[in-house]
């Protein structure tokens, strides 16, 4: 089953997250199928590739709770 979730990246105590599509059995920092955007919680900067996100949602990918909240704020879902 595909999940749209956050993948941690960045330096220690300066984290940022990539929004990726992964198999739900893979590790959090494992290999992603595709990157859909990024989010930096420290600077509130974020980028979402809406076309790719909608494509994977149509294929049946389920967003995690945090990603679901991000998509709601961006009015994608």
From Swiss-Prot:
The keyword Ribosomal protein applies. It is found in: Plastid, Chloroplast. Transmembrane segments: none annotated. This is Small ribosomal subunit protein bS16c. One of its GO terms (cellular component) is chloroplast. Keywords: Chloroplast, Plastid, Ribonucleoprotein, Ribosomal protein. It comes from Galdieria sulphuraria. Although originally identified as Cyanidium caldarium, these sequences derive from Galdieria sulphuraria. Its main location: plastid. The gene is rps16. Gene3D superfamilies: 3.30.1320.10. One of its GO terms (molecular function) is structural constituent of ribosome. The keyword Ribonucleoprotein applies.
């Amino acid at each position: 089953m595909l999940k749209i979730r956050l993948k941690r990246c960045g330096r220690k105590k300066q984290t940022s997250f990539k929004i990726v599509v992964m198999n739900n059995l893979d590790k959090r920092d494992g290999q992603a199928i595709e990157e859909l955007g990024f989010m930096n919680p420290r600077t509130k900067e974020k980028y979402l590739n809406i076309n790719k996100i909608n494509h994977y949602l149509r294929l049946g990918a389920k967003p995690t709770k945090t990603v679901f909240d991000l998509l709601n704020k961006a009015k994608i879902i």
